[in-house]
Every structure is written in C-alpha cells, then in structure tokens.
Amino acid sequence: MAPLISLQDVSKTYFNGDIAVEVLHHISLDIEAGEFVAIIGQSGSGKSTLMNILGCLDQPTSGSYFIEGENVSGFDSDELAALRRRTFGFIFQSYNLIPTASARENVEVPAVYAGVSARDRHDRAEALLQSLKLGERIDHRPNQLSGGQQQRVSIARALMNGGRVILADEPTGALDSQSGDEVMRLLRDMNENGHTVIVITHSREVAAQADRLIEISDGHIVADRSKKRRSNRDAAVGLAQRTREGFAAIADVSEAVKMALRALRANLFRTILTLLGIVIGVGSVVAMLAIGTGAQNSVLDRISSMGSDLLVVRPSMANFRGSAGGTNVTLVPADADAITELANVAFAVPEMTSTVTLRRGNIDYQTTANGTVPQFTEAKSWKIGRGEFINRNDMETYAPVAVLGETVVKTLFPEGSDPIGQYVLVNKIPFQVIGVMSGMGASAGGNDQDDVVLVPLTTGSMRLFGQRNIRTITVKVQDASAIDLTQERIQALLNERHRKDDTQITNMSSVREAFTETSNTMKFFLGSVAAISLLVGGIGVMNIMLVSVSERTREIGVRMATGARERDILVQFIVEALVVSAIGGAIGVVAGLSTGYAAKAFGMPVSFTPGPVALAFACAFLTGLLFGYLPARNASRLQPAVALSAD
C-alpha cells in the first residue's frame, strides 16, 4: 500500500527578479499514516517551506508530491483547497486566530468551507472546546484568552474537519513551559487516536517527543531516525470522513453576511466614515430628484391648468414696447371677435390689464385690474369661489361690478366679513363686489395669481384703463390635435387685418414641452451632482476594502489553509463591500426621504416616486459590487503560504 504522504525528488526555488534561491534540494520523503514525526532544523534550513508543501499551502518547483498514491503536484487552487479541507489540520506558532471571531467561531471555520450545517458546526465546535477544557471560554475572543488557551483553540480548529494529518508549526514556540508541555501532550493524544502528526520545530527537546525525527539543513534532509512506528490509520480515516463535503457554506449569503458584519464591527469608526460617503451620495440622489420632480410637477400642473388646448395672442415685442414710427399696441376687441369665427376655435378671451388702487374704509391697496369677458374662467380653468362671475349683461351695460382674488379679499376685508354685495373704490370709482375667485396660488413665474381684481372688459376700457387696445387674447381650440393649424390660421388672419406681422402667438402645448425638456435637463444635472457624491462614496468603499485586505492578509491565509477556495474569499470580501453599501444605501434612502419631507414642511414642492429611490439604492449596491471587486479579487489571489507569513 502506498504511504499516506510521499515526496519524490522535490525542490523549491524562489525567484526575485533574475535571482533564483533554491530552498529545498531534491527532497524525497515518505510518511505513513499514524506516524508522529518531528521535522527539526534551524532558521533558514527550509523546514517551514517543507511544511508548506506538505500541507498543500505551496507547490514544489519540481518533483512530485503524492497523497495516498495520488500525485497532487498538478492540482489547481480549488483542488488543493479541497485537499486541505478534508485532510489537514494546522496548528501555528502564533495561533493565527481570527481576532474578530469568538473561540467557537474560530473553531468552526474549516467546517464552514466544508459545507457543514450551522447546527452541526456549533455542536462539534462546542464538543471539541469542552474536551480541551475551554467550555467556559466558548464565546471569548482571542484577546480575552491566554496564549495556552489560544493554542488549544487552534488545536480544536485543526480537528474540526477530522484533521487526518496534523501539521504543527512550532506549536510551543510562543508558550511557557507548562503550556508547551500541555500542547505536546495533546499532540501525543491525537497521535494515539490515529492522527498523523507532523511537528515542525527547532527545539530538540520538542522533537525528542516524536517517534520519528527528520533533520533538515540548508534544504537537504541530513538525518531521518525512527524510534518506533505507529499505524492507527483506520481511526484517523474514519474521523476525517465524518466531514460532509459539498458546496462551501461561504456561498450561503447569510453566513457571508454574518462574517462581513463581524469584520466591519471590528473597525466601527472607519466603517461609519465609509458609510457616510454612501449615505450622502444616496441621500443626495433621493432628495434632489424628489425636490426637482416636485418643482417640475408643480410648474407643469400650473401650465396644465391653463390648458394644452390654448393659444395666447400678444402684440410682438417691438409693438408692445413701442418703436420709432410705430404704435404701441395693436390688438383690439374686434380681433378677438374675428378669431372666434375661425374653424376649430371654441372662443377667444380678450384681456386688458393695468395697475389700480383699491380702497375700502381706511385701507388702500395697489393691485392689478384685469378687464375680461365671461369665458375667462373656462379659458383659465379658474373656478369662481363665491358669488358669481361677470356675465354678458354686465358687458353690455358697462356694469361697475368686480370679482376679487383671494389675496385682495384678505387685504381689504381683514375682519373676515363677506365681501359679496359690498362696494370698493377702484381708482376712486365705486365697484360692487359680485364674486370671489377660488385660490390659485403662485403662477409658473412665481407671481401671486390671487392678487387681482376682475372687471368687465367694456367697463374697464371705458372707466379704468382709458384705452381700447387689449393686452392678450386667450384662444381655446376645439380639437387640440389641430392646434398648430389653428395657430397658423390665426396668425394669417391678424396679419391680414393689421396689414403687417405685429403679433406673436404662444402655444401652451409647446410651452409645456419646452419646460418639460428644460426641467428634465435640470433633473439630470442635479442627479449627476448627486451621483458624483455616490461615486466618492464608492471610492471610500474601495479604500476601506483595500485596507481591510492588507490588514487581514494573515486571516485570508488562515481561511485558505482551512479549506477556503479562491471564490470563497472573493465572495466574502464582495459581500463585505455590498453590506457596507446596502447599509449606507438604506440609511441614505431614509436620510433623503427625511430631507424631502422636511423641505415639504417648509412649503417646497416635493414629489417622491419609487423609481428614483429604488435606482439610488440599486446604484449604491452596484457601487459596492464594482468598487469591492478589485480588493476582493486581490484577496482571493493571495497564495496561502505568502498570506500566512504576512506581518
């Protein structure tokens, strides 16, 4: 039968640029199952390199390595990880416990990567710690344990998956004599129970306790002496086979998240600073888009309230302001009557405006007077609140009647009395109040639409404005789909009537489209500014992950030594980045929503929609994935032997 371990003509060479350093020279060595072997040598003799090759932490430059007759020299990283997981248990001089994990969690690590269920892991880890007299220290972290206790935790970890072969690297080197003797007794007991034990040491006193002593010097085996042979392979094999192979549990998201949270809590302040970048980024996106969308919707609602089936006719700017040799204003009420006769025109509403002074009692108030016609409310989609609006009879009789806006009512009637039927002076002329308009609020330009007094067009022209020219004509069309054609007909009609092109027509549908396009551009700009904050947060995630990989290099080596595959390490660090981003994203969403509601409380228009919130959170998650991948990849590509030797 083939030996359990067999090295045939194995050499190991390290390269530093063009310089080659051969550490092991043509080593040939067989170790039978159940042996207790000590490999002794001084510092620099090559004993640690030999241990790394024996434990599949490193591969030989040349030669062959057989385990139970199978050549493992050409195994890839995943195959070597599986071999370490089911065959080897490691005990290190510096214990190499994960500082953020409890004693039980440290012991469970090999079983995590072997796919053992959580309950089975817990039970076996507790049983091993109990057997090593650490039952009261199960939930203690390494910094709460003595050196001897930490080494016993590492022994329990080595036995977690069965530990058919125990590789102990200077197991007593960091311990006092009493603790060292206890560790050697435990190694002897493990050998008695069928484990193959290989101790790497420079101490002849420690080596003397083994059944076989292999001495190495300058990369050569110079002595190989045996006191006796043991063969307890059946017990060792049986123990190792209890470990269930399968997918590595690190692939289980819940397990990966637990590991990530534990690691992030270890550097809480640094984690909070990193979270802050994500929170600011996501919060900015949510708040800015909510406020931007709210402002857009508010203005669009105001524009829509004017109707998308409206055309507004005004004098051209040159004629409106006056020009050399020209008249000031060219529109007259007859133009509105002519427009009404065109096809697809429902009605045309002429308006003239002027600033007037109102008086009631001892209250004087300056506002805008608007002379208009009965169709005004329909054209402006502005309902009468109380009383009645101007009618045709008022127009024909030049009636001195007025309809007030809410702002005017509050100013002239501060005591809250009913203004209907009462008289107010408009430029010292008495007008009877017949109605009050419903509140409209600010216009798209920010002007108070309720600060107005409405009078019949005929009355205003004759008694208030002293002119017959009108300021605007609002045209409502019957078929909005033909509004462009109607606009062309109106323009042609006015050009013919005035014998020149002295008017301009605004299509409210076009205004809405133009504003929508402009506001979308502004939203994109605001979103871009917020996205830059999110990008900065992503860079913070990458930074913390790169630092984390650097600080936890030895931990990565320990995980690989206990059976973690490259993709297990990759997944673990990506999950850590995603956890940071997800927590930051969630807090950022809450912060953004809170900011939006605070803005709303101060009267700002705010509109929350699920899309931007989900998008912001998804971007945070994607940021964690993108910026966490590079550090995670760097971690997964570390060589176990190199990672374990990191400071």
From Swiss-Prot:
Any matching Pfam family: FtsX
Q: SUPFAM superfamilies under this entry?
A: P-loop containing nucleoside triphosphate hydrolases
> What biological-process terms (Gene Ontology) are attached?
response to antibiotic
How is this protein annotated for GO cellular component? plasma membrane
EC numbers, comma separated: 7.6.2.-
For this UniProt record, give its keywords in alphabetical order, as a comma-separated list.
Antibiotic resistance, ATP-binding, Cell inner membrane, Cell membrane, Membrane, Nucleotide-binding, Translocase, Transmembrane, Transmembrane helix, Transport
Query: What's a single GO MF annotation on this record?
Result: ATP binding
Give the matching Gene3D superfamilies: P-loop containing nucleotide triphosphate hydrolases (3.40.50.300)
Please indicate if the UniProt record lists Glycoprotein as a keyword. Answer: no
The function of this protein is: Non-canonical ABC transporter that contains transmembrane domains (TMD), which form a pore in the inner membrane, and an ATP-binding domain (NBD), which is responsible for energy generation. Confers resistance against macrolides.
Q: How does it assemble?
A: Homodimer.
The record's listing under PANTHER family reads: MACROLIDE EXPORT ATP-BINDING_PERMEASE PROTEIN MACB (PTHR30572:SF14), MEMBRANE COMPONENT OF TRANSPORTER-RELATED (PTHR30572)
Q: What is this protein called?
A: Macrolide export ATP-binding/permease protein MacB
> Lineage, please?
Bacteria, Pseudomonadati, Pseudomonadota, Alphaproteobacteria, Hyphomicrobiales
- The primary gene name is macB
